[in-house]
UniProtKB/Swiss-Prot annotation:
One of its GO terms (cellular component) is extracellular region. It is an enzyme of class 3 (hydrolase). This is Purple acid phosphatase 13. It catalyses: a phosphate monoester + H2O = an alcohol + phosphate. Disulfide bonds: none annotated. Zn(2+) binds at residue 416. Expressed in stems, leaves, flowers and siliques. Transmembrane segments: none annotated. PANTHER family: ACID PHOSPHATASE RELATED (PTHR22953), PURPLE ACID PHOSPHATASE 13 (PTHR22953:SF15). Belongs to the metallophosphoesterase superfamily. Purple acid phosphatase family. Substrate binds at residues 416-418.
């Protein structure tokens, strides 16, 4: 089913609040559980994504002053009255361990800003901090070590809710300021205030498909973007720019199978792809608050110091301190009357872990009269029926699902699986009207589309043999868990699944109703293939704390 929106369009991202969607007659979670649907694969769709060439104009550093800001992005703080502005100045370096990095103190981190429609108001100045990071390889490849340009982070505070601001970033003392950009703050957190449109996309990469996704996202004028892991895909390249061919690599994300080869053991990445990605995404990230959720491709382990997530945690700003997690891997923030919780699939989550303890404390503190909607997001999906990913994150689910269920999380977004899937409300593999709706949006442009399901004919194992239909017994942090019987048909908790590249849009209408849509690359930007009203029932599903 392809659904056309009736839209009131505008020409600029800054006027996103004027864009509306008029919808009638779509199914609702109140109608559920809905019968499982598997959308047929489009015969004209190439399921393999091809990377854009390194010569793509959007990758190239602008020919300008050395310290002029680039790779500019806006991200939210915990509440409406604060945002972060991040950017890069200078050029990265590739060389030996003892090569001198750029000095962060050689250029200031300053943002000048004011309300968009108050022309006579003096600009305000905010200052921040700057860093550089290193990505180091084994001693034999030390000549390929990467040192970033200077990465700046500035927090703006005291902002008004739902207000358009204009800003420039850089160092005015060096005449090294960016052009003017715009962002809109989130509405104040009440049961009546929500951002008009929230885009959710995962596993973007830098492919021709990513170009289409980015263009469609911009045309839909979002107020907020949530990007789930799989950004630059720098880890799919060696440090010498050689692309790793993993298309025939039949192994899980832990690299436990014998044929994984260099795809999971090289210990190398090509870090300049992070710079390409920052430039490529700037038309979106410089104007629309964008929140990042780490996934597998952001781990990037460094062989000699065991450091992980260096690029991810250095390049973006997170409301970690404001939300009390003090970690870029998991944090929370408010977007009007919606409370978002970001978790990490690749760090410890058992009940004695820092992540679990923080999650429980964050859930306890939520005021549902101010933020009725609670949305959680992380990389590995708990409820995927695609072959190779069925129950892939089982140990994480076992440790955390009760928490999310008892505190009545409404929606969960995941990525990692290069396909789209939406569940009925579910808890512990059982249909439950108080369980979350789980949505996998891991087809943002990169990788190869998953087209086989665990229940497809030929994928169902012989029950007389000792066979696991789950590709992995663990997900890189905890011990394996016992598997269950493989399904012989699409599980009833799987409401809709489709192999297509695209992204999703969440529009929260009020404290009980939200509209979700899946937008495919092969369709026009205003068309949706899967649309449903997600309805909360707080009277029936009270918080069990």
């Amino acid at each position: 089913m392809v659904v056309k929106y009736t839209m009131s369009m505008s020409f600029f991202v800054i006027f996103a609040s004027t864009v509306t969607i008029i919808v009638h007659g779509f199914p609702s979670t109140l109608d559920g559980p809905l019968n499982p649907v598997t959308a047929p694969l489009d015969p004209n769709l190439n399921p393999i994504a091809f990377d854009l060439p390194e010569s793509d104009p959007s990758f190239v550093k602008p020919i300008s002053e050395f310290l002029l800001p680039e790779q500019i992005s806006v991200s939210l703080s915990y509440s409406f009255d604060s945002v972060w502005i991040s950017w890069v100045t200078g050029e990265y370096q590739i060389g030996e361990k003892d090569s001198a990095p750029l000095d962060p103190n050689c250029v200031q981190s300053i943002v000048q800003y004011r309300e968009f429609d108050v022309r006579r108001t003096r600009k305000q100045n905010a200052t921040g901090h700057s860093i550089v990071y290193n990505q180091q390889y084994s001693s034999e490849n030390g000549f390929m070590n990467y040192t970033s340009g200077i990465i700046h982070h500035v927090q703006l505070t005291g902002l008004k809710p739902n207000t358009l601001y204009r800003y420039q970033c850089g160092d005015p003392s060096l005449s090294a300021m960016s052009k003017e950009y715009y962002f809109r703050t989130m509405p104040k957190s009440t049961s009546e205030n929500y951002p008009h449109r929230i885009v959710v996309a995962g596993d973007l990469g830098l492919t021709y498909n990513t170009s289409t996704v980015l263009g469609h996202i911009l045309s839909n004028h979002p107020d907020l973007v949530v990007l789930l892991g799989g950004f630059s895909y720098a880890d799919t390249y060696l440090a010498n720019k050689t692309k790793l061919d993993c298309s025939s690599c039949h192994c899980d994300q832990n690299g436990t199978s014998s044929d994984c080869g260099s795809c999971y053991s090289s210990g190398e990445t090509y870090q300049p792809r992070w710079d390409y990605w920052g430039r490529f995404m700037e038309p979106l990230t410089a104007n629309v608050p964008t929140m990042m959720v780490a996934g597998e491709h952001e781990i990037e382990p460094q062989t000699e110091n065991n450091l992980t997530f260096a690029a991810y945690s250095s390049r973006f700003a997170f409301p970690s301190n404001e939300s009390g997690s003090f970690s870029p891997l998991y944090y929370s923030f408010n977007a009007g009357g919606a409370h978002f919780i970001v978790l990490n699939s690749y760090t410890l989550y058992d009940n004695s872990s820092d992540q679990y303890i923080w999650l429980e404390s964050d859930l306890i503190k939520i005021n549902r009269s101010e933020t009725p909607w609670v949305v959680a997001t992380w990389s590995l999906p708990w409820y995927s029926t695609f072959k190779g990913h069925y129950r892939e994150a089982e140990s994480m689910r076992i440790h955390l699902e009760d928490l999310l269920y008892n505190y009545r999380v409404d929606i969960v977004f995941n990525s990692h699986v290069d396909a789209y899937e939406r569940s009925n409300r579910v808890y512990n593999y059982t249909l439950d009207q108080c369980g979350p709706v789980y949505i996998t949006t891991g087809a943002g442009g990169a990788g190869k589309l998953e087209t086989q399901h665990v229940d497809d004919p030929g994928n169902i194992p012989d029950p007389s043999q000792n066979y696991s239909c789950r590709s992995s017994g663990l997900n890189s942090t905890l011990e394996p868990v016992k598997d269950e019987t493989c399904p012989v048909k699409q599980p009833e908790y799987s409401a809709y699944r489709e192999s297509s590249f695209g992204f999703g849009i969440l529009e929260v209408k009020n404290e009980t109703h939200a509209l979700w849509s899946w937008n495919r690359n092969q369709d026009l930007y205003y068309l949706a293939a899967d649309v449903i009203h997600i309805v909360r029932q707080p009277e029936m599903c009270s918080v069990c704390n």
